[in-house]
Amino acid sequence: MAASCLVLLALCLLLPLLLLGGWKRWRRGRAARHVVAVVLGDVGRSPRMQYHALSLAMHGFSVTLLGFCNSKPHDELLQNNRIQIVGLTELQSLAVGPRVFQYGVKVVLQAMYLLWKLMWREPGAYIFLQNPPGLPSIAVCWFVGCLCGSKLVIDWHNYGYSIMGLVHGPNHPLVLLAKWYEKFFGRLSHLNLCVTNAMREDLADNWHIRAVTVYDKPASFFKETPLDLQHRLFMKLGSMHSPFRARSEPEDPVTERSAFTERDAGSGLVTRLRERPALLVSSTSWTEDEDFSILLAALEKFEQLTLDGHNLPSLVCVITGKGPLREYYSRLIHQKHFQHIQVCTPWLEAEDYPLLLGSADLGVCLHTSSSGLDLPMKVVDMFGCCLPVCAVNFKCLHELVKHEENGLVFEDSEELAAQLQMLFSNFPDPAGKLNQFRKNLRESQQLRWDESWVQTVLPLVMDT
């Protein structure tokens, strides 16, 4: 009797979904140029999914983009009438019972919520899904695809289980379960994209998943910033962050001066200050796969070199981003007592971030990759702005950073400090390494995202 009741209850729950799925399949046939894009994260901090949506819209698809709306996406996305952003609510864990139980309940509730959100949207010919995070979104998107006739496209940025392993350890039962889940449901997708050739080979060899490498490329708005725009940005940031403010007042009280530039009141001409500090930029999501103690230790060594009389400039170090370890590193930064270095950690508007990269002298990347198979998009953006980079070494970094060509690769804080000393000696030096790297980046004529997407992704969605 109890078994019959359970079967009847399951049918009652499943029948409406099957009927709705059949109706959506019919609807999908009438809307073959529609794509649903899903990221179980902050849309504003998911540039690659924003770029997918913009490229799809540019080539005639309408796009529904589902994700958390914690930060503002780029204006191009918001102003495109082919793209609709649907906000998801980030569910909080229950503060009851063991942590494993709390996590399990959250995953189940998140799955039901995402299923409900997807089933009541216009069905798409494709569901584009960012992974990670893939728990529970891979299974839910596959299930919705089965009901609605949509083809699931997974864009592999990394492995979710490897990120969990940084917190819990690689052999934790939750991590092993997440790996099995990711591997099993990942094989059920229709198309797979990934960010490096190393990941493509790993997916093929160890997961039996065929993927196409779609390298991260800078969007068109990542470019060198004209001096006039640099000055406006510095003045804007100076109103909120003291490192951008002028170190001394100009002789003419109507002259506008920042820490790096000044605008002549009469002609409106902007010039760089002769004794300006060097501007070093790093971007981070403040997670375990980026050890910012390396940068802080290198800055301490740089400070000591300056105090010892080496011909080095003052430094303004800007670290942008949001994430769980931001407060921890902010406390470490405040404990430092630098005389020649100023560090600030702003969260920039989407439109200001490319302008900052295009205004900086050097980028630093501390991303090491939990899997060793993904590449830091921040470096891609920096290269788009012709900004040379010092990057910490890991397995497949050579696919992006060419040592002594477009930047430098380091292993530890000692090596990074030596690189900073070499690059900033006699700053600004027109004949120095920094300018040579910048020249190489200008001459490389790298593909932009739109051009790369047309060559790699568009044929896949047009042919299948």
From Swiss-Prot:
Keywords: Congenital disorder of glycosylation, Disease variant, Endoplasmic reticulum, Glycosyltransferase, Membrane, Phosphoprotein, Signal-anchor, Transferase, Transmembrane, Transmembrane helix. It is found in: Endoplasmic reticulum membrane. It is a single-pass membrane protein. The chain crosses the membrane at residues 3-23. One of its GO terms (cellular component) is endoplasmic reticulum. Changing L114F: In CDG1K; decreased function in protein glycosylation as shown by rescue assays in an ALG1-deficient yeast strain. Changing M382K: In CDG1K; decreased function in protein glycosylation as shown by rescue assays in an ALG1-deficient yeast strain. Changing H367Q: In CDG1K; decreased function in protein glycosylation as shown by rescue assays in an ALG1-deficient yeast strain. It is linked to Congenital disorder of glycosylation 1K: A form of congenital disorder of glycosylation, a multisystem disorder caused by a defect in glycoprotein biosynthesis and characterized by under-glycosylated serum glycoproteins. Congenital disorders of glycosylation result in a wide variety of clinical features, such as defects in the nervous system development, psychomotor retardation, dysmorphic features, hypotonia, coagulation disorders, and immunodeficiency. This is Chitobiosyldiphosphodolichol beta-mannosyltransferase. Residues 100-120 dip into the membrane without crossing it. Changing D429E: No effect on function in protein glycosylation as shown by rescue assays in an ALG1-deficient yeast strain. The keyword Thylakoid does not apply. Changing Y353D: In CDG1K; decreased function in protein glycosylation as shown by rescue assays in an ALG1-deficient yeast strain. Residues 1-2 are lumenal. Pfam families: Glycos_transf_1. Residues 24-99, 121-464 are cytoplasmic. Changing S71F: In CDG1K; decreased function in protein glycosylation as shown by rescue assays in an ALG1-deficient yeast strain.
